[in-house]
Amino acid sequence: MSCEELEIVWNNIKAEARTLADCEPMLASFYHATLLKHENLGSALSYMLANKLSSPIMPAIAIREVVEEAYAADPEMIASAACDIQAVRTRDPAVDKYSTPLLYLKGFHALQAYRIGHWLWNQGRRALAIFLQNQVSVTFQVDIHPAAKIGRGIMLDHATGIVVGETAVIENDVSILQSVTLGGTGKSGGDRHPKIREGVMIGAGAKILGNIEVGRGAKIGAGSVVLQPVPPHTTAAGVPARIVGKPDSDKPSMDMDQHFNGINHTFEYGDGI
């Protein structure tokens, strides 16, 4: 995302906040504190994350210092946040404003907090990264290990119960619904978590376990248990999951179609890929 595009997103957010404050005076001070008083998206994000994740052990001012330090060192995190906002705005029919993810959606908040934790992890500040991971888990019910690698243009829809393991990879333009697990298969160490390629959509409650690849543009049905690699541009569903067809689009994450189009298999218990 270019500087100009980032500025457009931020300007849209502030314009919405002004309109919202005029329409609902009871929330005018809220919109001012969270959006209107800030000069840029990074400032608003640091304020929001600090206040969401503060605790008696680490007050908001201390968390905000950490967030601002991370953003100063790696401004691309702010651009990634803007891409995530655009992803939610364009994919979630319940979201009609750019400001909504920033103000209200815990999936977005958890993802931005993960980005800070990931930066801390890579800086060798792993104790603080794990502390932040715990705060995110307690506050948002989303557990993303700070060592996981996640791209931009990500939507964590509803988000409650999402788990992403230490060696998981999520590429750009992926949509993940609530209660999804990207987990391991046991207690062995090493590279043990799924690799989710660009454009994938993972339905609610799906469990993808082990060091397996879900190929570009694949779709995972809600409630599925995926134990084997999923080829690109296929639809997998069931317990255990098997290939049941192909998505209608190149990137199922963009259209969020939950139907299984072109099903070519009738499920029986125990079928698998």
Curated annotation (Swiss-Prot):
Question: One Pfam family for this entry, by name?
Answer: SATase_N
**SUPFAM superfamilies tied to this protein:** Trimeric LpxA-like enzymes
Protein family (similarity comment): Belongs to the transferase hexapeptide repeat family.
Q: What is its EC number?
A: 2.3.1.30
Where does it mainly reside?
A: cytoplasm
Q: How is its activity regulated?
A: Sensitive to feedback inhibition by L-cysteine.
Give the record's keywords alphabetically.
Answer: Acyltransferase, Amino-acid biosynthesis, Cysteine biosynthesis, Cytoplasm, Repeat, Transferase
Query: So what does this thing catalyse?
Result: L-serine + acetyl-CoA = O-acetyl-L-serine + CoA
One Gene Ontology biological process: response to X-ray
Q: Tell me, how does this one assemble?
A: Homohexamer; dimer of a homotrimer. Forms a cysteine synthase complex with 2 copies of CysK.
Location relative to the cell: Cytoplasm
Q: Where does the signal peptide begin and end?
A: none
Top-level enzyme category = transferase
Q: GO cellular component annotations, sorted alphabetically?
A: cysteine synthase complex; cytosol
Q: Which organism is it from?
A: Escherichia coli (strain K12)
- What name does this protein carry? Serine acetyltransferase
State if Methyltransferase is listed as a keyword: no
Pathway assigned to this chain's UniProt record:
Amino-acid biosynthesis; L-cysteine biosynthesis; L-cysteine from L-serine: step 1/2
Gene Ontology molecular function: any one: serine O-acetyltransferase activity
Family matches, as InterPro entries: Hexapep, Hexapep_transf_CS, LbH_SAT, Ser_AcTrfase_N, Ser_AcTrfase_N_sf, Ser_O-AcTrfase, Serine_acetyltransferase, Trimer_LpxA-like_sf
